[in-house]
Amino acid sequence: MNYLIVISFALLLMTGVESGRDAYIAKKENCTYFCALNPYCNDLCTKNGAKSGYCQWAGRYGNACWCIDLPDKVPIRIPGPCIGR
């Protein structure tokens, strides 16, 4: 019986958890996607697996796309310089 519990717990740990986060979606160079309209960002975010997205006007990184519930595998803007400029 104890083996069954241990094996079940091990399988639970090995499957991993796919979580989402709200953040600025970023290019490989740590640069945000410039935007002017919400539909552009919503399309970009949903194509990358987010629930939705919108254009954050005059935000921390200027006019940039903000995604809601973005998967962990998609790069987000982190503190530091944008290397591609």
From Swiss-Prot:
Recorded GO CC terms: extracellular region
Main location as per UniProt: secreted
Tissues showing expression: Expressed by the venom gland.
Alphabetically ordered keywords of this record: Disulfide bond, Neurotoxin, Secreted, Signal, Toxin
Signal peptide residues on this chain, from the entry's feature table: 1-19
Boundaries of every LCN-type CS-alpha/beta domain copy: 21-83
One GO BP annotation of this record: defense response
Location in the cell: Secreted
Gene Ontology MF term list: sodium channel inhibitor activity; toxin activity
Disulphide-bonded residues: C31-C82, C35-C55, C41-C65, C45-C67
UniProt comment concerning the protein's domains: Has the structural arrangement of an alpha-helix connected to antiparallel beta-sheets by disulfide bonds (CS-alpha/beta).
Function: This protein markedly relaxes the rat carbachol-precontracted anococcygeus muscle. This relaxation is inhibited by the inhibitor of nitric oxide (NO) synthase, N-nitro-L-arginine methyl ester (L-NAME), suggesting that the response induced by this protein is NO-mediated.
Family assignment from sequence similarity: Belongs to the long (4 C-C) scorpion toxin superfamily. Sodium channel inhibitor family. Alpha subfamily.
Protein name in UniProt: Makatoxin-3
